A protein has these predicted regions:
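N-terminal glycine-/charge-rich "phosphate-binding" loop or analogous flexible N-terminal tail
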Residues: 20-22
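Substrate-binding N-lobe of the ribokinase-like
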Residues: 3-4, 24-92
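Ribokinase/PfkB-type carbohydrate-kinase core domain
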Residues: 1-10, 70-84, 96-172
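Short N-terminal binding/cap micro-motifs at the start of the first secondary-structure element
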Residues: 13-17
Length: 172
C-alpha cells in the first residue's frame, strides 16, 4: 500500500486524576481512572486514518496489547507490520493529571516499543511501494536507524521529535 508508514509507539495509557502530582515519598488516592489506547505513534496513525489517509503502522506490542492493534485496524490502519512479541509487555504509561490545573506527569515503560530491530525494518522497507513516506516519533528505540535506512532506500522521512532529547540534534 502506497501511503504513510508510521514507525511508532503503541502504549496502554493508565490515566489517573489526582488533586496534585505525587511527590517523592508520598502516597495519594486518585479521584479518577481510565485506560486508553496511546503512544505518540498510535495516536498519529489513528488521526491519519480518521483524516482519510492511507496509513500502515509499524511497531511492536506484547500479547497484552492486541486490543491496540484491533482498534487501529477498525479505524482502517494497515496493521500487518505490527509485531506481537510474546516475551515482552506492550509499552505503557502511567499518567497523573491534576484535576484543577490539567498539569500532568508521565512515567513511561517502553516495552515492545524498544523491540524494533534493523532486520524487521529491512523487511518493511522491502515491501514498501515507491512513493511511500516514513513518519517517525521519538518513543521507539530505533528512530535514528530508521531515518538512515529510509534515506538509503529513497523514502522521505517526517519526524515528530517528541519526546525531545538531545540525541535528536545528532541525527541525520
Amino acid at each position: 500500500m502506497t501511503g504513510i508508514y508510521n514507525v511508532g509507539s503503541l502504549n496502554i495509557d493508565h490515566v489517573y486524576g489526582v488533586d496534585h502530582i505525587v511527590r517523592p515519598g508520598e502516597t495519594v488516592a486518585g479521584n479518577g481512572y481510565g485506560m486508553f489506547a496511546g503512544g505518540k505513534g498510535g495516536n498519529q496513525s489513528a488521526a491519519l486514518a480518521r483524516a482519510g489517509a492511507a496509513v500502515s503502522h509499524v511497531g511492536c506490542i506484547g500479547a497484552d496489547g492486541l486490543w491496540l492493534r484491533e482498534g487501529l485496524e477498525q479505524l482502517g490502519v494497515d496493521v500487518s507490520h505490527i509485531t506481537v512479541d510474546p516475551e515482552t509487555a506492550t509499552g505503557h504509561a502511567v499518567i497523573q493529571v491534576e484535576s484543577d490545573s490539567g498539569e500532568n506527569a508521565i512515567f513511561l515503560y517502553p516495552g515492545g516499543n524498544h523491540r524494533i530491530s534493523p532486520e524487521s525494518m529491512r523487511a518493511v522497507f522491502s515491501q514498501m511501494p515507491t512513493g511511500s513516506i516514513v513518519l517517525l516519533q521519538n518513543e521507539i528505540n530505533a528512530t535514528s536507524d530508521v531515518i538512515v535506512q529510509a534515506a538509503n532506500e529513497g523514502y522521505p522521512v517526517y519526524l515528530n521529535p517528541a519526546p525531545f532529547h538531545s540525541q535528536v540534534l545528532d541525527w541525520p
